[in-house]
Amino acid sequence: MAFTFKQFHIDDLNCGMPVSTDGVILGAWAPLAEAKNILDIGAGSGLLSLMAAQRSQGQITAVELEEKAAAACRYNMTQSPWAKRCQLVHGDIQSVCQLAQYQGYFDHIICNPPYFEHGPKASEQHRAMARHTETLGFTPLLDAISQCLSFEGYASLILPIQSLARFKACLNDTALYLVREVWVKSVENKAANRALLLLSKTEVEPYQRTDLTIRGEDGNYTEQMIELTKDFYLKL
């Protein structure tokens, strides 16, 4: 399936995870404007990488393990206005983080991690790889962030609410701090089902916890959502 944004186009036909509202929200929310070196872990089709390229002047490094997704990511990067600032690394993030040139190198890391911790696997192997934490669990993900993030850098993620407690338990075993958290509601007056998280190597006070509602009771995007995503969605 192809998806056209205001400044770039995504072809995600061969990716395990297609373009999603989760990814768009994360890419629009992450504080990327001042970042000079940005790492996209588990890049998939390259959506977050290209959103980061649009929102910053930084160099983008995308890491993707699955072969078909990596090919789609590379293609989407080369077709974008920011091809010269984007590079794809086809491999696993643990190996990438062992490379000396990447340790402590990135001032922003962005990731929409796999989120099915339990339950039946997807039927196609590449889709299952994208959605199951056994490919990249929270502990190795946080280890990779710790290795690659600069001391003054930030990491932005989005997770299902039901995974939040387990993620925070893993976070407690690292030298990373949760400095900002946004609970995301799909519809007004419904319980939040996603959380945007901002991590840092330095503790920030006061800790911030806010809310974002995607749609009102009338089914239309809220003013919050419009303001957040207006630079990307064609009809906003």
From Swiss-Prot:
Pfam families linked: MTS
BP-aspect Gene Ontology terms: methylation; tRNA processing
The protein's enzyme class: transferase
Localization per Swiss-Prot or TrEMBL: Cytoplasm
PROSITE patterns linked to this entry: N6_MTASE (PS00092)
GO molecular function: nucleic acid binding; tRNA (adenine-N6)-methyltransferase activity
EC code: 2.1.1.223
Xref: Gene3D superfamilies: Vaccinia Virus protein VP39
Catalytically driven reaction(s): adenosine(37) in tRNA1(Val) + S-adenosyl-L-methionine = N(6)-methyladenosine(37) in tRNA1(Val) + S-adenosyl-L-homocysteine + H(+)
Record's function text: Specifically methylates the adenine in position 37 of tRNA(1)(Val) (anticodon cmo5UAC).
Name assigned to this protein: tRNA1(Val) (adenine(37)-N6)-methyltransferase
Organism of this sequence: Shewanella sp. (strain MR-4)
Native organism taxonomy: Bacteria, Pseudomonadati, Pseudomonadota, Gammaproteobacteria, Alteromonadales
